[in-house]
Amino acid sequence: YFSFNHNSSFYFFKDFEKRQNGYTSLVFEELSELLLNYNLRDSQIISSGSYWDANIEIDILTITDNEEVYVAECKWTNHIINKKELHKLNEKCKKLDIKPIQTIFFSKRGFSKELLNNQGKDLALYSSNDFEALVRTTKSNELIKDLFS
């Protein structure tokens, strides 16, 4: 049995307020992976999720059955993503000895002009508008099915 009085609710919401950005960032990563996998729906995905070891963390590492590798970083910040972030992700891939077919960034606030100019087959950039399009064009039961598969 748990009692929730006025004081405990005050501390709960104060604690939540401190951690809200972390929670939101985690949800943003999950939704980013969902969007990536939705866009790769014609491929057979054999593995998708975050990768980390003692030295390297990659937000999303997706591998298809034909051994195509996709790496993605999710940035829930108030800053735009610039080419420095691309270089950091490329360095992580070199250290892991992987050669992604595509590098992907998901951003809350958008991208530098330099990064936007490099967008193409090897580099995909997604903003909040892309999530809105996913929700508008996808049936909710498809999203839910993909979320729990």
Features from the language model and the residues they span:
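A cross-kingdom feature that marks ATP-driven nucleic-acid transaction machinery
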Residues: 1-149
